[in-house]
């Protein structure tokens, strides 16, 4: 299983990563730049890391997840990823109109350096698997989130696996659940071939 570190928005955090791991970053448009920051209205322009600076320092072999906090930045993200020769990545949490737009681009190979491998669809206890799988020919990943209950049972896993889609789990602490729930989730997926998990505590997943 690949370990993707949650919310790596500074160079200090990036420097601390195992080079075999991946990272999730939060991307916003601010003062004519793409910057890494999670919370709106709390941006200190003096301390913001630009996405380009992040990419110029990116050496990890794992997947880079781009959690989009602003719309309309997708093309610039792809351009920068191409510039720095980063190919192992995907967009997360696009609004539905933009997701559909870019899913069609991916399916039709309309953008250089952008393919279904760079998109995920969401599946959770609130978001039905059937909806996510309706995009199966346009995406490479299923993002499995857990708000109140873990949705990935054997039936759901087999449906995803039959479409040759990679699974990225959301570790329970990212939704405010107790850290002990990591152990419970690990037990539930012990017989599944899970590609990745996004977590604050990769050491508890290893």
Q: Can you describe what each PLM-predicted range is?
A:
Residues 1-206:
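Phosphate-group recognition and catalysis centered on beta-loop-alpha active-site segments
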């Amino acid at each position: 299983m690949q370990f993707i570190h949650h919310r790596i928005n500074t160079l200090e955090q990036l420097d601390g990563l195992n080079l075999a791991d991946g990272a999730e970053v939060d991307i916003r448009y601010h003062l004519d730049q793409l910057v890494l920051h999670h919370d709106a209205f709390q941006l200190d322009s003096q301390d913001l890391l630009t996405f380009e600076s992040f990419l110029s320092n990116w050496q990890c072999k794992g997947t880079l997840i781009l959690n989009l906090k602003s719309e309309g930045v997708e093309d610039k993200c792809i351009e920068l990823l191409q510039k720095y020769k980063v190919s192992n990545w995907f967009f997360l949490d696009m609004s539905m109109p933009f997701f559909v737009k870019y899913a069609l681009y991916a399916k039709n190979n309309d953008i250089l350096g952008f393919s279904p491998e760079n998109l995920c669809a969401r599946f959770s206890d609130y978001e039905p698997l059937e909806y996510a799988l309706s995009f199966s020919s346009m995406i490479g990943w299923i993002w499995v989130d857990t708000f109140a209950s873990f949705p990935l049972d054997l039936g759901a896993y087999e449906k995803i696996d039959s479409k040759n889609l990679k699974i990225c789990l959301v570790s329970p602490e990212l939704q405010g659940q107790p850290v002990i729930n990591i152990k419970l989730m690990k037990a539930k997926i012990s017989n599944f071939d899970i590609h990745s998990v996004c977590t604050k505590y990769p050491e508890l997943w290893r």
